[in-house]
């Protein structure tokens, strides 16, 4: 659905008629957030019938905090505020991934129009000076907003456009800012990958290195950045969902390969759960991203061992990132003296899932057999990112 005329800031000031969160425009006849409009669309398109958890149809609270707790009451509220069932396009199945088109554009150099270009809200957080630019690019939510008529590449350039802060935490616990359907997991994963590139370019210290060193660091760290992103933005990692997304099953996949992938998905679940248990804030995530990125160790490219041009500078940047994180935790969490050590001890677990498994599960449907490293290099060199 297209947004009404006017600035994004004005649209975001209009509350969702269903849950009271910030709306992203008119959906099915009423102002609604992307979470509620998506829920309504899926419910109507799939002809869902829900049962109230409390047995009191319509009695459950439907607000930003509780909107995901009772689907029956949420759907009832959607209908009460006059969301139009007839406006849901039943004849149209799940849309073809716009991310696939976006990736293709970077290889073809073309621009195309899309009615489903992604939008990433962002906001600035107080942070140490070393990470000022980084924190400004850290989004508080991964929304699936539709911006009609916007060129897809232009949408990618605008990933970090500042918007009002989203009230997304209760006692430091991240809230789910949108419901992720199975068909959207690949798109969310691709967005995390794009954001890693945008993030790397936003770090002033990173851009001072030679292009060769920048690309080598990014190619080596993308897996850890991706897993950190999953932990930060609550992308679902249950095995059934991910296997459904990838299309792999016992009928079409070698049993040894399938068992390996399931084992690594379980490892991914464990590491993500450990990060979420510690309830990291945006600055801590930014520091950890720098720590895993600035690794001055030789990397392999096939059978070739490549060395960095300025390994000393890279090592110094990692030291600075660790010192910054330690200082920040000491100030922000004075009652948790072991927090810094706990976070560092979690970092090796980020590599418990192989790059090939991430590509197979999250990206193969989106970009086919294009290697992620090739995509990273191509997009990082693009002036549009």
UniProtKB/Swiss-Prot annotation:
**Which key words are in the record?**
Activator, Developmental protein, DNA-binding, Metal-binding, Nucleus, Receptor, Repressor, Transcription, Transcription regulation, Zinc, Zinc-finger
Residues of the DNA-binding region: 16-83
Instruction: State its location(s).
Output: Nucleus
Keyword Cytoplasm attached: no
NR C4-type ZnF:
16-36, 52-78
InterPro entries listed in its UniProt record: NHR-like_dom_sf, Nucl_hrmn_rcpt_lig-bd, Nuclear_hormone_rcpt_NR2, Nuclear_hrmn_rcpt, Znf_hrmn_rcpt, Znf_NHR/GATA
Annotated NR LBD domain ranges read: 155-383
Q: Which GO BP terms sit in this record?
A: cell differentiation; negative regulation of transcription by RNA polymerase II
Q: What is its main location?
A: nucleus
Q: In which tissues is it expressed?
A: Expressed exclusively in the neuroepithelium of the embryonic brain.
Alphabetical GO CC annotations of the entry are: nucleus
Q: Name one GO molecular function term.
A: zinc ion binding
Q: Share what the entry says about its subunit structure, partners included.
A: Monomer.
This chain's function reads: Orphan receptor that binds DNA as a monomer to hormone response elements (HRE) containing an extended core motif half-site sequence 5'-AAGGTCA-3' in which the 5' flanking nucleotides participate in determining receptor specificity. May be required to pattern anterior brain differentiation. Involved in the regulation of retinal development.
Q: Which family does it belong to?
A: Belongs to the nuclear hormone receptor family. NR2 subfamily.
By what name is this protein known?
Nuclear receptor subfamily 2 group E member 1
Which species is listed as the source?
Gallus gallus
- State the organism's lineage: Eukaryota, Metazoa, Chordata, Craniata, Vertebrata
Q: Which gene encodes it?
A: NR2E1
């Amino acid at each position: 659905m297209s947004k009404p005329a006017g600035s994004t800031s004005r649209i975001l000031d209009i509350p969702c008629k269903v849950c009271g969160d910030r709306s992203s425009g008119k959906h099915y006849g009423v102002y609604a957030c992307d979470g509620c409009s998506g829920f309504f669309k899926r419910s109507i398109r799939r002809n869902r019938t829900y049962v109230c958890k409390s047995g009191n149809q319509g009695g459950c609270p439907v607000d930003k905090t509780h909107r995901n707790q009772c689907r029956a009451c949420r759907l009832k509220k959607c209908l009460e505020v006059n969301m139009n069932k007839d406006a849901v396009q039943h004849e149209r199945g799940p849309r073809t991934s716009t991310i696939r088109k976006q990736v293709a554009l970077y290889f073809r150099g073309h621009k195309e129009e899309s009615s489903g270009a992604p939008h990433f809200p962002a906001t600035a957080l107080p942070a140490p000076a070393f990470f000022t630019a980084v924190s400004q690019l850290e989004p508080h939510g991964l929304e699936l907003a539709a911006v009609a008529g916007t060129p897809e590449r232009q949408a990618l350039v605008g990933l970090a456009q500042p918007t009002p802060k989203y009230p997304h935490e209760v006692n430091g616990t991240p809230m789910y800012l949108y419901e992720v359907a199975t068909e959207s997991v690949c798109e969310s994963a691709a967005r995390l990958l794009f954001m890693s590139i945008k993030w790397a370019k936003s770090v002033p210290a990173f851009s001072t290195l030679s292009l060769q060193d920048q690309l080598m660091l990014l190619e080596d760290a993308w897996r850890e950045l991706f897993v950190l992103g999953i932990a930060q933005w609550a992308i679902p990692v249950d095995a059934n969902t991910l296997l459904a997304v990838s299309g792999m099953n016992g009928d079409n996949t070698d049993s040894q390969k399938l068992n390996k992938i399931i084992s690594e998905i379980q490892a991914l679940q464990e590491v993500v759960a450990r990060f979420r248990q510690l309830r990291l804030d945006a600055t801590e995530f930014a520091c950890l991203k720098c720590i895993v990125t600035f690794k001055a160790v030789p990397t392999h490219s096939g059978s070739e061992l490549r060395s960095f041009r300025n390994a000393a500078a890279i090592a110094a940047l990692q030291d600075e990132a660790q010192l910054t994180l330690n200082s920040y935790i000491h100030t922000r969490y004075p009652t948790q003296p072991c927090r810094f050590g706990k976070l560092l001890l979690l970092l090796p677990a980020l590599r418990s899932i192989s790059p090939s498994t991430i590509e197979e599960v999250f990206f193969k449907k989106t970009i086919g057999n294009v290697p992620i490293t090739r995509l990273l290099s191509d997009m990082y060199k693009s002036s549009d990112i």
